[in-house]
Amino acid sequence: MAGGAREVLTLQLGHFAGFVGAHWWNQQDAALGRATDSKEPPGELCPDVLYRTGRTLHGQETYTPRLILMDLKGSLSSLKEEGGLYRDKQLDAAIAWQGKLTTHKEELYPKNPYLQDFLSAEGVLSSDGVWRVKSIPNGKGSSPLPTATTPKPLIPTEASIRVWSDFLRVHLHPRSICMIQKYNHDGEAGRLEAFGQGESVLKEPKYQEELEDRLHFYVEECDYLQGFQILCDLHDGFSGVGAKAAELLQDEYSGRGIITWGLLPGPYHRGEAQRNIYRLLNTAFGLVHLTAHSSLVCPLSLGGSLGLRPEPPVSFPYLHYDATLPFHCSAILATALDTVTVPYRLCSSPVSMVHLADMLSFCGKKVVTAGAIIPFPLAPGQSLPDSLMQFGGATPWTPLSACGEPSGTRCFAQSVVLRGIDRACHTSQLTPGTPPPSALHACTTGEEILAQYLQQQQPGVMSSSHLLLTPCRVAPPYPHLFSSCSPPGMVLDGSPKGAAVESIPVFGALCSSSSLHQTLEALARDLTKLDLRRWASFMDAGVEHDDVAELLQELQSLAQCYQGGDSLVD
């Protein structure tokens, strides 16, 4: 890679992971498209960390995610498994057989109207099989900003979104998509429901070799591979796929960082007994096995609990979302993910994945929690110290790891990112001679303000902080969730007027927290209450009773890591 980027290879495992990933890649794509805008801050994030350059058979330059994704049969909708950039119609039409032919033509799945609109604006696949790009001469970045003659882009509606590929606006490399054909996405039969089923998938030579081949393809072209980020469904059989994938990565690429994001969709209901028990077992097995093979593991969910007792989903002061819609939940989680992963994607002075994990995971604490303020509430005329002082002494961010409210818990170490605040708002603009209303108002730089605020909130705790000018992109197809924000994401009184919100400031954090002690112990308690004889179907998928006993022991040992007062400064 040019420029010495510290490359990261992303693995997306599961359908909800596909939803989060689609929003994540759309946000990366939107940021690429703004890189040449004179109003934008200079490049703070290095896209080459996540993307790779390539060429089609016809010499067209491409810039595609360094990505391997796995999903089930029936989950792609109109998206082709080989992608759209590299397809050659002339090769497709070349037939060596000279005898009589019988043609069987499969009916194409209708393309989502939003994607039709997006593709027609971007370019066309001509009759000679060459992708003719209308507005992207070198493959990097998106279309330029709309002009007066540019038709307004179509915005996808919630009703039009059935699967994640319905709103993915990024072209993928042919080596990205790996379909598990033996299980179905739709229907009640043939589902990938249990951890043991997922483990078995990557024990099969067919799928293991396919994953290894794709890994080697991407890894061998890297100059400095810093590691892997895994987006993995925890609630279904993909927890087993993720566990085996992490084990494979640890065995083959020792010394590289492996950061796993365990994803769980919106709220669940007490009446769905089998689904809830399976979710509990999959989550517990997934957390324990992923922790064993990853540098760091972070559950991500808008739910209030990982256990059997349903808790209401989290709420945000300036967001209105439907927790039953994966399209909404995944957008919020992708925004948090885009923020907390900033340290290992920086252009200058990046923190490697390994160093980030080492800082947060001391004394065996390899599971961390995430939290975010989306959007960060900066009103017109306010400075950063003004906004931070409004939080008082409370932990400011909304919890995103289904571990309950962070108030009253202990933080052992944290990595914090605040992005999207204009430099003019970083410090307080007091009239000369006016005494500063707080110690934060007396600071001379935004970085100093953020560091001092974190020290006030968590005295003596190891904190790493980053302050970026670059906001988080929330242009369509990101859903319209913001209740009182201007287009640049400033918090307003009343409903916004005019243009939709395009970008927002976000305050995100990863924390090694004592809340995990209660969460993991509660998970173990729920498991001890199960009569496993009633769930023979889960056990028949490849899990033994001894495995459950070992799981309970591992969960309790992991929970003990977060008990007591030990920290880096104790």
Curated annotation (Swiss-Prot):
In terms of Gene3D superfamilies, this protein maps to: Tubulin/FtsZ, GTPase domain
What is the annotated tissue distribution of the protein whose record heads this document? Present in all cell lines tested (at protein level). Widely expressed.
One GO cellular component term of this record is: mitochondrion
Q: Which residues cross the membrane?
A: none
Q: Which Pfam families match?
A: Misat_Tub_SegII, Tubulin_3
Primary site of residence: mitochondrion
Q: What is the effect of changing R345C?
A: In MMYAT; uncertain significance
Clinical disorder:
Myopathy, mitochondrial, and ataxia: A neuromuscular disorder characterized by muscle weakness and atrophy, ataxia, poor growth, delayed motor development, dysdiadochokinesia, dysmetria and additional neurologic features. Some patients show skeletal and endocrine anomalies, as well as behavioral psychiatric manifestations. MMYAT transmission pattern is consistent with autosomal dominant inheritance in some families, and autosomal recessive inheritance in others.
Q: Which family does it belong to?
A: Belongs to the misato family.
- The name of this protein is Protein misato homolog 1
Q: Which species does the entry assign this protein to?
A: Homo sapiens
